[in-house]
């Protein structure tokens, strides 16, 4: 669905969130895959403080530990811009302040799976997807955990944190930071139902 009229020239986030929430997953995914770099930048800036995110936005509270939840993504890079981030709760059900995940994408053979931990960010309402943290466990069907400094992952994941902001119930937008500095890399995620 084409919703650029709700983004350009200035994002109307309340209306955009309402429409995204009313769409089914296929239409929501089609919509976010149409958003270009300029629109992702606008949305990220506009989403500052708009919808407070919690870990439940990435893995709903009714999911058991080690059950995968898929978020489809589109980034602002010129190539390899469709991917998935797959999330789960830790095996220890009492550990409620962290999620685990990895990047499922076509060039994982070269970069590795890009494992990360997910925590609430220092800024209220934001979530950090942190590639600097070591993930100690994973669902059995996920790829082997390898350090993010192995393979070409050292150029992609090592030292990186994705700072996430909320747009709607299923859609969030992020910007990558490396070594504390913002990168010119944005992406949008859409959670599967």
Where are the regions a protein language model picked out?
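Soluble ligand-binding/transfer domains with enclosed cavities or grooves
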Residues: 1-193
């Amino acid at each position: 669905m084409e919703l650029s009229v709700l983004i350009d020239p200035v994002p109307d986030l309340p209306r955009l969130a309402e429409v995204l929430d009313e769409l089914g997953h296929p239409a929501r995914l089609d919509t976010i895959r149409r958003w270009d770099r300029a629109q992702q930048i606008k949305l990220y800036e506009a989403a500052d403080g708009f919808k407070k995110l919690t870990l439940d936005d990435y893995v709903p509270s009714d999911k058991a530990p080690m059950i995968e939840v898929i978020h489809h993504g589109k980034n602002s890079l010129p190539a390899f811009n469709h991917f998935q981030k797959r999330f789960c709760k830790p095996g220890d059900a009492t550990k409620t302040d962290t999620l685990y995940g990895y990047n499922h994408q076509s060039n994982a053979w070269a970069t590795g799976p890009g494992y990360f931990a997910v925590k609430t960010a220092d800024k209220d309402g934001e979530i950090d997807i942190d590639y600097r943290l070591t993930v100690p466990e994973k669902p059995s069907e996920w790829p082997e955990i390898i350090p993010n400094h192995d393979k070409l992952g050292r150029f992609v994941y090592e030292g990186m944190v994705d700072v996430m902001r909320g747009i709607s119930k299923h859609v969030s937008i992020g910007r990558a930071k490396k070594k504390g500095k913002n990168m010119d890399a944005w992406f949008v995620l859409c959670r599967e139902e």
